């Protein structure tokens, strides 16, 4: 009995000593407890990020004439439709970025700043192919948002959407980055969207998608929902793309893009196997315009393109983005397969027409 009592006392003493040592280790060397340290590092609030950026998100009110098919006579066949949207101040000089669809066909546009001032902006330029528009207001030096880098976003990063949903000014919703580089949505010509589960509602269009540091990483543009009872999936235009569009509009009044005069399509697995292509790279040229740069470089319908400027090409969308990222006069080295043999061609980019074929 005495031996059992001694054993229990020894066991309890060991447990107490072990807990005491563990407690001291956590106090002295918290870096040795990564799980606990990681929890301590998480922000309890994103209020600081909102404070840094919310004043740079403005409200937009537009009016446009809309044809009313139910009008009883010709005099009342049109009605005035009022819409709410958002824009982001990206330059203290008064430059604002919003969506092209926000200002398209608007008969009146008004901007309301976070301090309540209201003015009519000038439209500096638009780019329908990325759904972006650059506006400017003359209200002195304004508080511009800090630009982040959308290329550094990772799936799972926390993001906040700031906008004017349903006319409710400076509303903030939280979510994560669900995906990057989203395409095939048939929303615009050049799709490279950030997908997020942050709520993006009517009026959020043109608003800011920010990271946890309060930096702009995207321009909110669209939400997809299966039906009225389904929570939608939000999409934003990456700030890296928006930055390039803005600079071109500032310099040229429009966006000037390269053009190769070809129509690519994705390869199926069966086509890739038949051609002996072991990697996932490769797109099929289904059309090469006779008077285009690709035809001048002897590219032909039926060619399979593997690389453009040394970069493996995996999809139609990627090929279009590479082509559009050039400027007229740039040379694009193309590597491909024709009738089982590899070839290389040098395409001199032309200027993409406003309504490309």
Language-model segments: residues:
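Conserved catalytic motifs of ABC-family nucleotide-binding domains
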Residues: 302
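Short alpha-helical segments in extracytoplasmic peptidoglycan/chitin-binding modules
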Residues: 305
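Short strand-turn-strand beta-turns centered on an Asx-Gly dipeptide
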Residues: 308-313
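Serine-dependent protease modules
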Residues: 2-16, 23-281, 286-290, 297, ...
């Amino acid at each position: 009995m005495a031996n059992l009592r001694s054993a229990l006392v020894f066991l309890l003493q060991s447990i107490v000593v072990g807990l005491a040592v563990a407690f001291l280790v956590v106090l002295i060397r918290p870096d040795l407890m990564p799980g606990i340290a990681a929890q301590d590092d998480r922000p309890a609030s994103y209020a600081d990020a909102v404070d840094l950026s919310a004043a740079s998100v403005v409200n937009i009110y537009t009016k446009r004439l809309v044809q009313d098919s139910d009008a009883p006579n010709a005099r009342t066949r049109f009605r005035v439709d009022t819409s709410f949207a958002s824009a982001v101040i990206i330059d203290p000089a008064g430059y604002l970025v919003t969506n092209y669809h926000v200002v398209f066909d608007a008969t009146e546009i008004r901007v309301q700043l976070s301090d309540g001032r209201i003015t009519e902006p000038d439209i500096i330029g638009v780019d329908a192919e990325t759904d972006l528009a650059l506006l400017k207001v003359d209200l002195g030096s304004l508080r511009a948002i800090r630009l982040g880098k959308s290329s550094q976003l990772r799936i799972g990063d926390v993001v906040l959407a700031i906008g004017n949903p349903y006319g409710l000014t400076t509303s903030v919703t939280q979510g994560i980055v669900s995906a990057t580089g989203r395409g095939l949505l048939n929303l615009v010509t050049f799709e490279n969207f950030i997908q997020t589960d942050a709520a993006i509602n009517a009026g959020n269009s043109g608003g800011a998608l920010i990271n946890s540091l309060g930096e702009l990483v995207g321009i909110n543009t669209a939400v997809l929902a299966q039906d009225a009872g389904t929570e939608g999936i939000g999409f934003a235009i990456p700030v890296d793309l928006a930055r390039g569009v803005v600079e071109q509009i500032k310099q040229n009044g429009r966006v000037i893009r390269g053009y190769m005069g070809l129509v690519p399509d994705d390869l199926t697995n069966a086509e890739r196997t038949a051609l002996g292509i072991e990697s996932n790279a490769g797109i099929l040229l289904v059309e090469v315009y006779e008077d285009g740069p690709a035809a001048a470089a002897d590219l032909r319908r039926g060619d399979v393109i593997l690389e453009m400027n040394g970069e493996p090409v995996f999809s139609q969308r990627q090929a279009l983005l590479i082509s559009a990222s050039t400027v007229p006069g740039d040379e694009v080295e193309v590597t491909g397969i024709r009738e089982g043999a590899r070839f290389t061609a040098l395409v001199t980019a032309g200027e993409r027409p406003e309504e490309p074929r």
